[in-house]
Amino acid sequence: VSIGIRLTEAAFSLSNPSLEFDAMNYSIQKFQNALSDAERQVLQLCLQEAMQAVPDDAVPWYLGDAASPTGYLKPEHAKVLLSLRQDWLTEPQGLRWDTPEKTPASRSLALAKLAAELSDLGHVTGWRNEKFSYWPDTTILANGHPIEPTDKLAAAFEMERAAYRFFGLRAHAVHVNGFTEDGYMWCGRRSMAKATDPGMLDNMAAGGLTVGESLQSCGVREMAEEAGLSEALALSAVAQGQVTTCRAVPRGWHYETLWVYNLLMPADLKPVNQDGEVAEFSLLSPQQVVQAIAEKQMTVDAACVVAHAVLHACGLQEVEQNGAVVQRAL
């Protein structure tokens, strides 16, 4: 079962490009020009594999009278929900949360109680005390164009982020590539204390979009916390669209839209972690970055963000996902 293609460009104009964009684009071009055809194919493969098919045994679940799935459950997770709540009903196409709660606030409260119970029973681990908002796809895409998922009132509900994979919900995150003028890239190595992908290479800064945050404020926060960058520098990051990744993971279904930003780092500035989530930063050549991706030393999401940024530097890029070729022009 395929849930389709999500590979779109952000709304920034090339008719009046900023100086920051010109310099950034030149840096990314240098990165790409340094790659061999084989190395470019490694990046292509990242995007080809970004969206995995939903497992055949996955159980879709629906919110109220929704026609499209809200999320995807592992079979054992579906059984747990049916054992805990009477308003989760079995239907031929999956489960339906036939909740009497009709407002985002009341749904959120009901789900908060359910998520806490699942955590107490050991079905949800790594509790973060951070909430993500859930928007149906139709809210994110307006007339075919991506919009910032920042309007809390437009969300169907909000929930503890640790429970998102259990329920197979689509989350959002901001990822920032740190390029230098000579086409090198700053990459962080995740702390060994991280619950997910400890010790692996990552983008310079990245983090989930929490309730009430804008994409820009999320990026500025993450660049300060993870890389020690000033707000003034962080605000110069250039948006470059989004790429969605989804795959089966031990805790459930990972489904996340990654909002890509590129930042041109000053030559005399090295990122310095502030929150303990990054063990070290390394300035890597294009070849070293691609080698890390090929050898699975970089997280899947970070690799997709790098591939998205680099392969789109030349304007028109063909990417095959789930058997279909997508063409997008900057």
Protein language model annotation of sequence segments:
Residues 11-12, 16-200, 208-224, 229-272, ...:
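N-terminal leader/linker segments that precede catalytic domains of diphosphate-processing enzymes
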Residues 283:
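Short aromatic/basic micro-patch
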Residues 1, 9-11:
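Acidic, Ala/Val/Gly-enriched low-complexity intrinsically disordered segments
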